[in-house]
Amino acid sequence: MQHQVKACGDSKSTTRSLQGNRRSGAASLKKPSGNGTFLATDVTNLDMNSSFLSKKLKRNGNPVIGMNIQSSNAFLGAQLAANNFNFAQQLNHAALYNNLEFQMAVASGDVPSLMSMPAHKPSLSVSSIDPSMDMSQFTEELNAIQNMSYSPMMPSSAALQSIFAANDSSAISPYMNLQKTSLLPTSTLRVSGARKNRIVEVKTLNDRMVIVSIDPQATASTRPNIIPLNRPLMSVAQNCIDMTKKRPLSAEALYSRKVFIGGLPIDVAEEEVWATFGAFGKVLVDWPRRPEHNNGRGGDNMYEVEMGRRNLRSVSGYVFLVFTNERSVQELVNACEFYENKYYLQLSSPTMSDKAVQVRPWRLSDIDYFCDDSCSVDHRRTVFIGGVPRPTRASDLASSLQDYYGKVSYVGIDIDPELKYPKGAARVTFANSQSFVRAISGRFVQVTHAETNKRVEIKPYVMEDQHCDECQGVLCKHNYAPYFCGDSSCLQYYCEACWDRMHYIVCDSRADHRPMVRTGDQTRILPRPPHHQSSHYSPRSHQMMNHDSMESSNQSRGNTSSIISRIVNRNSAASVMDRQTTKPFAATPAVIGY
């Protein structure tokens, strides 16, 4: 008896709303832990479910959303213990499934009535069962479908429709004689399950809702794929979409056209994502991809499988959306539920109903931060920070740096120029030189924003078109300085001559400094100056060679040398005189009177 009660309770009689009502008070007071960076937690889903459910019931009172409370485990157990439970009268067969498509199909008679029988009562006689349909025939048809070989001559959807439309087993025999094709190996069939990037939009054609899908890499002559919507959307109600269109929208752009969607169900269909977000406007669904490791599977066809897949597979937990118009992003945000400073939208999958997924738009007002209007911005006190989490706002980064190193006058988040979406880097200008030097010496900072907490590195921000700080362009014919020394003892721009003089002659402790070079949008730290062509470069050996060459040039050249050479020789001669007053280095210990 206990087993039967448990089995009856396992049928889909309780929805997420009923589960939310049964949760304990401690669980309802528990806040999200924040361990997951992008995926919503179970506690968040339970808390959000009551908010979604109440608003849905107030809007349309859909009976499909509310379930029969009498089908709970406690009620079934009490009735079975009293031995007076009538399955045919008490159980609402339509309430066992919250899939609107299935209920519509049962009502129209498109599926066998055997599917609507109560669970665990195979001997129950229901008048609506077709007498010509028995379990053996149904099992035979299912086995025939599963064992059917693939053939490119006939689409699989048409074949399945023909099989389900037939009531006799003789109609299945032509499909069981299909020959297996040799065009693709069997192991490559799962490649079709990989999610693909598509530009989608929900439109109305001939009074029918359809999804227009097209490959973003296709040519202009490629015809789009039209998918009819034979059912209402499982995620966003139509009245909710209409309500968002009635809300006032800003004429100025408020968000980036690129939106992050996190916490997707692992088995969500890409068509469900298309239908949900394509209703707000034309959008590119960009599934992130990562390398696929075969782990020894594939056999002899490993090369074909990996080449057909291009060593990539889609990541199911999140997706990026790139809308054509920024207005669509505003409508999407208006349709979301705002909960604990985050936006959520419901989305369903075959195994999860009304899953709360996070919608994370990027506000354009979070790109820059200014301490005040009167604060000056000096690029010589600017640092570069890479690896910044994309949800981090400029004000959050400024607050983290001020707690560690000092006052910040400006913070700018590096964004994509077209989409205005963060690239994961930032530039920070300090209010004074002391804070700038402390930040360069500290090298790291802990950035905290919402659920993210990351340690990032601080580097000097190298600018282009800067003259040498030592000679002001005199020794390099007024060319721009190619090197920048990021050590806290230097922090200057140098030409080639001044780099050698300041690092190998004037100060011995700077010989191990490494130059920083700006190439395009990137800054590289080189192991040695590029004008030193020796593959076995050593700072100490170059220091001695440079000193000998400068000393010999002073003896060989007279007053007929150029002004640049005289300046270099004068500086090197002065440094030699200063070095002669010091005690030379000796490997053996010095004695008194040496």
UniProtKB/Swiss-Prot annotation:
Keywords: Developmental protein, Differentiation, Repeat, RNA-binding, Spermatogenesis. Residues 11-22, 535-560 have a biased composition (Polar residues). Pfam families: CEBP_ZZ, RRM_7. Interacts with fbf-1. SUPFAM superfamilies: RNA-binding domain, RBD. GO terms for cellular component: cytoplasm; neuron projection; nucleus; synapse. Residues 1-33, 519-560 are annotated as: Disordered. The keyword Metal-binding does not apply. It comes from Caenorhabditis remanei. SMART domains: RRM. PROSITE patterns: RRM (PS50102). GO terms for biological process: cell differentiation; negative regulation of cytoplasmic translation; spermatogenesis. The lineage of its organism: Eukaryota, Metazoa, Ecdysozoa, Nematoda, Chromadorea. GO terms for molecular function: mRNA 3'-UTR binding; mRNA regulatory element binding translation repressor activity; ribosome binding; translation factor activity, RNA binding. InterPro entries: CEBP_ZZ, CEBP_ZZ_sf, CPEB, Nucleotide-bd_a/b_plait_sf, RBD_domain_sf, RRM_dom. It comes from the Eukaryota. Cytoplasmic polyadenylation element binding protein that binds to and regulates the translation of specific mRNAs. Essential for progression through meiosis. Involved in spermatogenesis. This is Cytoplasmic polyadenylation element-binding protein 1. The keyword Repeat applies. Residues 257-364, 381-452 form the RRM domain.
